[in-house]
From Swiss-Prot:
Residue ranges occupied by any RGS domain in the UniProt entry: 85-200
Keyword list, A-Z: Cell membrane, Cytoplasm, GTPase activation, Membrane, Signal transduction inhibitor
Gene Ontology CC: cytoplasmic side of plasma membrane; cytosol; plasma membrane
Membrane topology label: Peripheral membrane protein
Gene name of the record: Rgs1
Any Pfam family matching the protein: RGS
Protein name stated in the entry: Regulator of G-protein signaling 1
Organism: Mus musculus
Subunit record text: Interacts with GNAI1 and GNAQ.
Record localization: Cell membrane; Cytoplasm, Cytosol
Upper taxonomic lineage: Eukaryota, Metazoa, Chordata, Craniata, Vertebrata
Amino acid sequence: MRAAAISMPRLNKMPGMFFSASPKDSKEHSHSLLDDKKQKKRPKTFGMDVKTYLRSMIPHLESGMKSAKSKDILSAEEVMQWSQSLEKLLANQTGQNVFGRFLKSEFSEENIEFWLACEDYKKTETDLLHNKAENIYKAFVHSDAVKQINIDFHTRESTAKKIKTPTPTSFDEAQKVIYSLMEKDSYPRFLKSNIYLNLLNDLQANTLK
């Protein structure tokens, strides 16, 4: 505000000009000051907590887990293929979303979130492995993790040791356990669920139109 005061014309040299500015000029000046204040108030980012990390890593799950793509993109045949194997289901991003929605209804969405986190981790550049490994471990594997996955003590301890000197395969053992759990437990129920069957029926009905 001090800079604005200095730049104003002196009143004794310009009589009658103090209130002569047009409303438009006043508004533009006010907007400029507000913009400056907004820029100064922008928060600085010093790092990501676990929740922010998860959102950035698997945004299509954290954004509400849509039940399907628009019907002109997703076909009934594609959805039918999801019933062939869990592998085919998870190979499709919409399949991941729909399955994630089902797991959320069963309060076990941490399983697919961990599986996806592991898939993302394998593609990570070497210099970023340590930081990402710690985030995944804290989010899913640690005994106090907010989204703790259901793995045995041996696998948990083994994973903890591996991330001390992380490699792209550090979470493979734990990921296989969770995949097997989803394949034998959640996946068969998913194929019988209203979430899956209603989606398939809707798409088949649209195909006949």
